[in-house]
């Protein structure tokens, strides 16, 4: 396998920058996920690696070798698309072997590679079938197998699960993760689905409007987002955002607005003071699971507020409750056994250690 290096890579169309200063090292044997909304530049970035798009500025290195001007066939990469692009008149075996036959590889080696890949993907029993006799998941496995037999330096996957139904996507996410472990492959995986990114990636690159917003492990992306965009894009349901002011009283800090007053813990307060945010406007980000329902037996804290239940989403293991607290509309994740009805008035508390504060102007997170 191989490492990749993007050195300030840019892509422009008619003077319009679609990928802006993409600077990143992809480690050998890493599964790196590029995630972001449609049009953020993630697929364009992948196509530049494949050689299907030219690089406007910067350098792309595979194992230390500059490949900007190398044609796709000389880059030793394999690509899997959301459309399987299988030849309908060929068997599964012939579809998987097609690229090797074009290279004039020996028949014995072709057979060995195809059967080895089929064993890994558990499709040996399908080798004599044609694509029309396969399910969507089986076709996707064949498309993966066609890439595996080439034994490339790098696998590129461009939204390969988009055409599958929800249940099959979950299964195939696991299959691709297992495949990565077995092959010890370097994989760059593109998706707009943040759940795929969180569950599959060794690291995640969050992109928006052609720019890298954050590169980190899934845990850090979720708990320590770099900015407001990352915080809002990653997580389902999304993070709650509250606009307010950092108020100082008797040496302590509170986040306040017309609807809510939250006491800021000592360590967070100290850092906010040091960075000059006392008395300033900020945005507080609260994950739905970091808002809890208070009961009559709970001790009252400063970060407690009253809310009215608007809608419940019962997902079985959990309950997503949409509430109004004054002028603030919030999403709350509670245990599935919680008994709450629309119209109820409930008391909620915020786990302040988990709140992320953002600069109101730059929208950058403040830690």
From Swiss-Prot:
GO terms, biological process: carbohydrate transport
Superkingdom of the organism of origin: Bacteria
Protein name: Uncharacterized ABC transporter ATP-binding protein YurJ
UniProt-recorded Gene Ontology molecular function terms: ABC-type transporter activity; ATP binding; ATP hydrolysis activity
Family according to the record: Belongs to the ABC transporter superfamily.
Listed Pfam families: ABC_tran, OB_MalK, TOBE
PANTHER family xrefs: MALTODEXTRIN IMPORT ATP-BINDING PROTEIN MSMX, OSMOPROTECTIVE COMPOUNDS UPTAKE ATP-BINDING PROTEIN GGTA
Residues in ABC transporter domain copies: 4-234
Transmembrane annotation, as ranges: none
EC number(s) per entry: 7.-.-.-
InterPro entries according to UniProt: AAA+_ATPase, ABC_transporter-like_ATP-bd, ABC_transporter-like_CS, ABC_transpr_MalK-like, ABC_transpr_MalK/UgpC-like, Mo/tungstate-bd_C_term_dom, NA-bd_OB-fold, OB_MalK-like
Gene3D superfamilies associated with the record: 2.40.50.100, Nucleic acid-binding proteins, P-loop containing nucleotide triphosphate hydrolases
GO CC term, one of those recorded: ATP-binding cassette (ABC) transporter complex, substrate-binding subunit-containing
Keywords for the protein's UniProt record, in alphabetical order: ATP-binding, Nucleotide-binding, Translocase, Transport
Residues holding ATP: 36-43
